[in-house]
């Protein structure tokens, strides 16, 4: 590894890796010392090892604050989803993993396909500033996004407000569908799983 690459990626001599703690698929637990554990921390440690430097984890409760901190110089690499809005201040590599996001639709809704979600009057619970929030903000034309803090917050909002749709990571929605009577978990283009 050239010294220029090491200096560019780890200017302090330690690779400071920003970790999004909200993504339970990439951060599964905490070590006894408090360090995050899972795919994202392991990847950061492997990158640091290949650079010949140590790793220091810079945890963030959600992806939005992690992205905001890009301009503050508190981390060297961040492990969050590629998103055009974030690319204004973050230079992304090719994705290292793909995680499907989809919809959980309330049983009281007449929605039968993903294409039917984007219509006037449809209210979608969503984790604020998640990659899928940013994507849907750019692409939906009629449905209303109702934001909550984090994945748990969006689930609670969906249930408490009786919203039509919950947008989220498919693996989490698979667990959520089991907790709510008469909901549909969608994949493109039609319903797939009923809870």
What is each PLM-predicted segment?
Residues 186-193:
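Conserved small/polar residues in nucleotide/adenosyl-binding loops
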Residues 27-32, 44-54, 129-150, 178:
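Ligand-binding cleft/hinge of the Venus flytrap
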Residues 3-81, 86-88:
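Extracytoplasmic small-molecule ligand-binding "clamshell" domains
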Residues 96, 105-123:
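Flexible hinge/capping segments at coil-to-helix
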Residues 64, 81-89, 159-185:
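A ligand-binding cleft/hinge motif common to bilobed small-molecule-binding domains
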Residues 14-21, 37, 115-132:
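Short loop->beta-strand "edge-of-pocket" segments that line small-molecule binding or catalytic clefts
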Residues 47, 69-71, 117, 157-160:
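Hydrophobic residues within well-ordered alpha-helices
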């Amino acid at each position: 590894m050239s010294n220029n690459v090491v200096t560019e990626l780890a200017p302090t001599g330690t690779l400071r890796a920003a970790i999004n703690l909200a993504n339970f698929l990439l951060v599964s637990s905490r070590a006894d010392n408090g360090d995050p554990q899972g795919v994202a921390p392991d990847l950061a440690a492997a990158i640091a090892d290949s650079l010949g430097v140590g790793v220091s984890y810079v945890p963030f409760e959600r992806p939005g604050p992690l992205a905001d901190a890009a301009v503050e110089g508190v981390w060297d690499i961040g492990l969050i989803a590629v998103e055009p809005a974030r690319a204004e201040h973050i230079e992304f590599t090719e994705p290292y993993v793909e995680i499907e996001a989809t919809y959980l639709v309330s049983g009281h809704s007449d929605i039968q396909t993903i294409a039917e979600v984007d219509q006037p009057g449809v209210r979608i619970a969503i984790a604020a500033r998640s990659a899928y929030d940013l994507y849907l903000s750019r692409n939906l034309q009629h449905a209303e996004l109702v934001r909550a803090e984090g994945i748990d917050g969006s689930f609670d909002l969906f249930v408490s407000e009786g919203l039509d749709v919950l947008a989220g990571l498919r693996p989490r929605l698979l667990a959520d569908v089991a907790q709510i009577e008469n909901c549909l978990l969608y994949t493109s283009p039609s319903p797939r799983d009923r809870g």
